Amino acid sequence: MEFTGQIPPYSINRPLSESEYNYQLKQKDKLETELYHQLSVIEINSNWLEIVDKYFFDKGAITFSIGILLCGMLTLTIMILFVGVEQIYKNNYEALIVFLPLLITLPSITYFCKQIKKEINYTHYPIRFNRKTRMVHVFHHDGTVLSVKWDKVFFTQIPVTYGMWDTVGHILDEDGVTVRETFGLPTCGLGREGREVGKGYWEFIRRYMEEGPAGVVDVISGCLPIKDKKETLAFSFERIAAALGSYLNPFILIFYIFYPGRMIAMHFSKIPQWPADIEAQCQRVEGHDPFFRDASMNP
């Protein structure tokens, strides 16, 4: 689980680093690597491809972890108030000192509530690649949409935490050097092997945009059923098992621990809706589209 870009945010308003130049992924350069779709596709058709954000797969971990902390802090706060008020009622005003921990707990509770709101907001933050208009549309956490030309995005791989690597798109200033905004693709891997998987995912996106859907559609084993509804608990279990290769994978227990938080975050989050002007730009092919896939066609 890795949350760079959400907590903490990506570093922006800075020049590109030497490492980012070295690991740049260019739109016109084909990579001879295995393609990966990372179970991230919501819909693909002849005109556009829609995927989830980087944080979708780990959604709920922040809610669960911070929820546990909040329960502890709220319990401590109530105990402090109870003891303090009881002592004041007994005219023991020296007991006012017990309220000092509230100077830490109350601001901490406020801070953690703000962090939870980063998850309990939208169910996911879709990214749409329109190969006809050659535009990329990124749904922001505040409900606004970033629209940028495909050829203007500086794609690269960056090291984040615990030896992991993100595959990201940088929006550069007019000088072509200063990073103004960054969005992450839904692939984050550990070490060199993880970086290679990230390249395979990038090539999946790049090949769709540059060569069309024919070369990538057969790679997709299934689509996420979240286009117009919230993820169910049953599908969530199936998705994790598919990602790990088996229900018997011991790492699946780690994800199960956070599932109460995921269900809470999903239940109280809104389903994202693209603005009308974006939908108008992203028309599907009339009639039969041999490259159309969504969750209704899952095996």
Task: Label the predicted regions.
Residues 126, 143-148, 177-182:
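Short, mixed charged/polar active-site loops
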Residues 41-59, 165-168:
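Short, hydrophobic/proline-enriched secondary-structure or compact coil segments at domain edges
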Residues 1-43:
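Short, non-transmembrane cytosolic segments of multipass membrane proteins
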Residues 135-136, 143-162:
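Phosphoinositide-dependent membrane-docking surfaces
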